[in-house]
Amino acid sequence: MEHSTEILYNKTEVYCSAVHRFGSDALLLARFAEPKRLQRAADLCSGCGIVSLEWHDRGHRGPCIGLELQPEGSALLSAAVEEQDIGHLTPVCADLRTFRQGEGSFDVCACNPPYFTDGPQSQNAAHALARHENTCTLDDVCRCAFRLLKDGGRLSLCHRPERLAEVLAVL
C-alpha cells in the first residue's frame, strides 16, 4: 500500500494516505486524552492511528487498541505497528457498533468521530465515511466507549463547538 510517513517528536512513524491522514485536532485530542503509562486504552475511529501512535510516542506502553471501520486506515496502522515493533498496540478493523472485545476493561477511550450529520458529502466514499455520520453516529461512539470503559474510566472526544449541546445530551 502506498503511503507517506509523518514522524512524531520522539521518532514514531505514522503512515498516511490521501484518505487517511490527520490534522491538529487529532494531536490535541491525543495530548488531552493521554493515558498513564500502563493504562489500557482504546482509540476509536482511529483512521491511520495517529492518536494511539502519539500516545506511544509520548511513552504509553499499556495495552492499546486502534479500532477503525475502514480497512485501509486499519492497514496503515497495522503496517506502522509491525514495522516499528509496537507490540502493545493492536489495530482492529471492526465496526464499533458491534465491537465487544474487552468490555469493561479499558481505562481510557478517545475518539475523533465523524463531525457532520448533513450537508454536502465527498464523492469519495472513504472521505464521506470519515467526515459524516453515515455509519457511525455520536450515539454509537458513546455506546461503544461505555461498553469498553471500566468504572471510573474516561472518554475524551474532539468535536465541533456547534454540536456541544448534542454531545452533552448524548453523554
Functional labels for PLM-detected ranges:
Residues 1-36:
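Class I SAM-dependent transferase core
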Residues 17, 65, 129, 152-155:
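Conserved short-loop catalytic and cofactor-binding motifs
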Residues 20-24, 135, 158:
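Short, conserved micro-motifs enriched in small and acidic residues
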Residues 24, 100, 166:
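Residues that form or flank phosphate/diphosphate-binding pockets in enzymes
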Residues 25, 76, 140:
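Charged catalytic carboxylate motif
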Residues 28-103, 108-111, 117-122, 162:
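Conserved SAM/SAH cofactor-binding pocket of Class I
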Residues 113-140, 144-147:
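Mobile active-site "lid"/loop adjacent to the S-adenosyl-L-methionine
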Residues 137-171:
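Conserved Class I SAM-dependent methyltransferase catalytic core
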